[in-house]
Amino acid sequence: MSKKSLKIITLGDSYVGKTSVFNNFVTGKYEINECTVSPSFYSKTLTIENEPVILNVWDTCSQERFNGLSPIYYRWSNCYTLCFDIHNEKSFKNLDKWMDEARKFCIGKVPFVLIGTKKDIPRTDKSISKERIEQWCKNIEDQGIIDRVHYFETSAKFSQNITESYNAALKLALEHYNKNQKPPITTPAIDSLQEVKPGYCC
């Protein structure tokens, strides 16, 4: 029996900390480094309900610096994580832009997990209030874009809600795959753990 191959991509503005979240999920560590501009790729075989599943996670990193992401990063995605900095107004407002781009290039109704980063930093008057975030989620649900928005506030520095957010994404990705039966994903012939380069800013 062939293994199911699931693809999850990570989206969000530069410097919101999405690469730190990604690296923490992959390595369990938090490291500060210079921002990288090439996407990172991670692949691992998991067993879910006694069935082998290949999980492929793409961190798009700073590809948004160019004229939009290449459609290749979106192709055959089963779920995406949408990241913003809970202390950065612009990154919150740009969630709609990222979601629109994902909906444009992804095939079918692809689910997503909303991730707020830098939970370890105390909120101030300039931070995004939980009420605004809840309202954004409600608006998305009311529009029928997704039945339920799964939202997690995370801290890569202290490994808070990292595993939980990606477990939710994995569950949604598997449900999407089972409904759509996508063809296998072509992935680079690399050792994915070596390809992941810990970084802070993207």
Curated annotation (Swiss-Prot):
Recorded topology in the membrane: Lipid-anchor
Superkingdom classification of source: Eukaryota
PROSITE patterns reported in the protein's UniProt record: RAB
Motif position, Effector region: 34-41
Residues with lipidation of kind S-geranylgeranyl cysteine: 201-202
GO cellular component: late endosome; lysosome; phagocytic vesicle; plasma membrane
Location relative to the cell: Cell membrane
InterPro entries documented for this protein: P-loop_NTPase, Small_GTP-bd, Small_GTPase
Keywords for the protein's UniProt record, in alphabetical order: Cell membrane, GTP-binding, Lipoprotein, Membrane, Nucleotide-binding, Prenylation
Residues that coordinate or bind GTP: 12-19, 59-63, 117-120
GO function terms (MF aspect): GTP binding; GTPase activity
Gene Ontology process terms (BP): hypotonic response; phagosome-lysosome fusion
PANTHER family listed in its UniProt record: RAB FAMILY, RAS-RELATED PROTEIN RAB-7A
Family: Belongs to the small GTPase superfamily. Rab family.
The protein's name in its UniProt record: Ras-related protein RabM
